[in-house]
């Protein structure tokens, strides 16, 4: 009902920025701790998003899970695609999504991750959450490449509009 009527509650964004890293542990090495605040609308600076993305994005492969580790994960890449879309970084979102397509197997399944120094899939699994993240990212992207610009049919466009209004 909220999205349909376009009535968005006002969140205390400052409070969420303060509480996001409440335990004091430095999580700057994990990509999800970079893009989740953007995904949630806690942060919304496009330049900051792009600067932080440089620490994790390996062009041609996807988004690393951990900054210092030589592996990309498909779920993190897909979630980062959605974060990029919400904050008007459509070209980057499309690049990342296109990068991960090479990892889809003949059955249409994506692996959890790829260790690029050793050129192996790691961990050796095809997790359901990874494949769900790819589907959600594909849904989000599909509306940016079509003639349908109705934000009411795309939850991610609704999120972008919501975050811009707060």
Which role fits each region the language model picked out?
Residues 3-73, 95-166:
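Extended glycan-interaction surfaces of carbohydrate-active proteins
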């Amino acid at each position: 009902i909220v999205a349909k009527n376009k009535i968005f509650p006002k969140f205390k964004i400052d409070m969420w920025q303060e509480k996001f890293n409440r335990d004091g542990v430095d999580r700057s090495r994990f990509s999800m701790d970079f893009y989740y605040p953007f995904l949630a609308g806690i942060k919304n600076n496009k330049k900051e998003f792009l600067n932080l993305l440089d620490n994790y994005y390996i062009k041609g492969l996807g988004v690393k899970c951990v900054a210092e580790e030589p592996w990309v994960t498909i779920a993190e890449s897909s979630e980062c695609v959605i974060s990029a879309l919400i904050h008007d970084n459509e070209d980057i979102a499309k690049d990342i999504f296109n990068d991960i397509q090479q990892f889809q197997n003949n059955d249409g399944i994506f692996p959890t991750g790829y260790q690029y120094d050793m050129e192996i899939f790691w961990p050796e699994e095809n997790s359901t959450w990874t494949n769900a993240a790819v589907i959600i990212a594909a849904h989000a992207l599909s509306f940016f490449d079509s003639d349908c610009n109705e934000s009411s049919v795309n939850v991610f466009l609704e999120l972008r509009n919501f975050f811009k209004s707060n």
